Design a protein with these regions (language model features):
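N-terminal small/polar loop signature for handling phosphorylated ligands or for N-terminal nucleophile
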Residues: 89-152, 253-308
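Gly/Ser/Thr-enriched, mixed-charge loops and adjacent short helices
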Residues: 12-16, 35-40, 44, 153-281, ...
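Short acidic, glycine/serine/threonine-rich loops at helix termini
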Residues: 99-104, 129-133, 151-157, 185, ...
Length: 553
């Protein structure tokens, strides 16, 4: 008697699958039975964020069949729930198979009578979001696995506002995709009655750049300091053309590249991980900065939604800023310039996530700008923008995980515009005789020193997941009495929407008298429980050590 997954293997070997796929399955049978089981023991889950998985043959892998099935489910949902004519914009990053998966997605949508707009080559998420809004499309799809390892790819679904889908649409799409149980249910080939597939080229880039240029705040400072030396690396990803073009359009003249990392390559050969949060991913760019005497390094990940930066400290050494520090500098710069230009009238707001530094709130309060605190994930920032559209103005928003956006043209993390504002802010600081590092110290001097850190505790297997669940129960029933020696004065339980005003989420926050906050949440994607520390005060380093000891037991 064959086990369940072997029956699925047999159906792929005997079914209407291409010969290359069958050959790879036979190779796994002979040489890697464990890998074979992992590839077929379940279906790759289409979750509320779309698909993400290792590429390869099988039901539990990203391949043309699983991508086709996801697209057919999405097409079925759109046709059943939206008024026609329907259209979708598609973009893709530099990962292996991204162009092929994008083309398969386009073919399936067209075969289902849905008009497709697809980029002619790799483009950042920001351009996909912008194109959805510009073309007034019903949805958008980005083929990417963000900064995951090279073995991965993914499929993100966006809605007509250019933001990732949220409830209830996300769950309804998931349910529709789940009904597509076999590739034979997919219309892979567009027939004579197919909708058109229209290619988008540089004209969309120009439209995007012309739009976001209207948001810039200090052209005089840039003109006076156009010679500041900037090193930019796309880390083999989709920022490779648009970011340098944006910086040049702003007027910057000394943009240095890392030639090896300007090569679009889904194997990311020069880095361990294409993640701008990792110091090693910026090492080559920092070396160029040291060689050329540059004061600023900027890096973006494969889909160009996150930005990592390095700046020169007072000793002349390049130091990496974390996502909270970059968001703080940008928020301070943008709100101060809005204030100086007379653009603030009480109808502006910023958005941060609940695990992002409270320094953003302190800065916004100084300028009389409202702050929204939302759940983790940029889709919740975009959700606030959608709800306030036409009433109040979104200035900027960010999260601790290196994502930031400015203005309402794009509804997701936008690394190209983040790079532009970091560069403009550097020029503005230079006009005052300061570096970005010194500007950050000035911000701390004015608003207080804020330090953020994170610990992740891994609990493996089924027992580990049960232990994590029990830890959350224990923290709810017996919250800590003190944090780093200061009494806890407030507990927020995000499973209670009636109290938070946010969708229910398994997150707890503890605030102490000193103004520190600890956020506890299980990871949505890994067997981990995460503790985020937001610490305020001159003794932040000591308090950080105390909290790490308190919560890593």
């Amino acid at each position: 008697m064959e086990t369940g997954y072997m029956q699925v293997v047999k159906s792929w070997l005997e079914g209407n699958f291409d010969e290359a796929t069958k050959a790879q399955i036979r190779e796994l049978q002979q040489n890697d039975p464990v890998g074979l089981e992992d590839a077929f023991y379940r279906n790759l889950e289409f979750g509320t964020g779309g698909l993400r998985g290792i590429m390869g043959v099988g039901t539990n892998r990203m391949n043309k069949y699983t991508v086709g099935m996801a697209t057919q489910g999405l097409a079925n949902y759109m046709k059943a729930n939206l008024e026609g004519p329907l259209s979708v914009c598609i973009s893709f990053d530099s990962r292996n198979n991204s162009p092929e998966f994008a083309q398969i997605t386009a073919n399936v949508l067209a075969a289902n009578g849905i008009h497709v707009y697809i980029f002619d080559k790799l483009h950042p998420i920001a351009l996909m979001s912008y194109s959805v809004r510009t073309k007034k499309a019903n949805a958008g799809i980005m083929i990417t696995a963000s900064h995951n390892p090279k073995e991965y790819n993914g499929y993100k679904v966006f809605w007509s506002d250019g933001a990732q889908v949220t409830s209830p649409v996300d769950k309804d799409i998931v349910a529709e995709v789940a009904k597509i149980t076999d590739p034979s249910m997919v219309k892979f080939e567009p027939g004579a009655d197919a909708a058109p597939i229209e290619v988008m080229g540089h004209e969309m880039d120009e439209a995007y750049l012309n739009s976001v240029m209207t948001l810039m705040l200090s052209p005089e400072a840039v003109a006076a300091h156009k010679d500041i030396k900037i090193v930019y690396t796309p880390i083999h990803g989709s920022g490779v053309e648009i970011v340098p073009e944006f910086l040049q359009k702003l007027g910057f003249e000394n943009i240095y590249h890392v030639p090896e990392q300007d090569v679009v390559d889904g194997n990311f050969p020069t880095v361990m991980s294409p993640n701008p949060e990792e110091p090693s991913a910026l090492a080559m760019a920092v070396a160029v900065a040291d060689r050329e005497g540059a004061d600023l390094v900027m890096a973006t990940d494969p889909d160009a939604d996150r930005i990592g930066i390095a700046v020169r400290d007072n000793e002349g050494k390049m130091v990496l800023l974390n996502g909270n520090q970059t968001a703080s500098i940008l928020t301070y710069y943008i709100l101060r310039r809005w204030s100086e230009l007379g653009k603030l009238d009480g109808k502006q707001y910023i958005v941060k996530t609940i695990v992002t530094t409270e320094l953003l709130r302190a800065i916004a309060e100084k300028y009389g700008v409202k702050v929204y605190n939302v759940l983790t994930g940029f889709k919740w920032i975009a959700d606030i923008v959608k709800k306030n559209e036409g009433e109040t103005t979104f200035v900027c928003g960010g999260e601790e995980s290196y994502g930031f956006n400015v203005g309402e043209f794009v509804r997701d993390k936008d690394a190209p515009i983040s790079c532009a504002f970091v560069a403009e802010c550097a020029a503005w600081a230079a006009a005052q005789g300061k570096t970005l590092y010194q500007l950050l110290q000035d911000i701390y001097a004015e608003f207080g020193y804020y330090k953020e850190s994170l610990i992740s505790v891994t609990k493996k297997g089924k027992a580990g997941l049960e232990e994590i669940a029990q830890m959350m129960v224990d923290y709810r029933q017996n919250p800590p009495k003190e944090l780093a020696g200061s009494p806890v004065i407030k507990v927020i339980d995000y499973t209670k929407p009636e109290e938070t005003g946010l969708p229910s989420s398994n997150v707890l926050q503890f605030y102490n008298e000193a103004g520190d906050v600890v956020t506890v949440r299980p990871s949505g994607t890994e067997p981990k429980i995460k503790f985020y520390f937001g610490i305020k005060g001159a003794d932040a380093d000591a308090k950080n050590e105390a909290l790490r000891a308190q919560f890593s037991k």
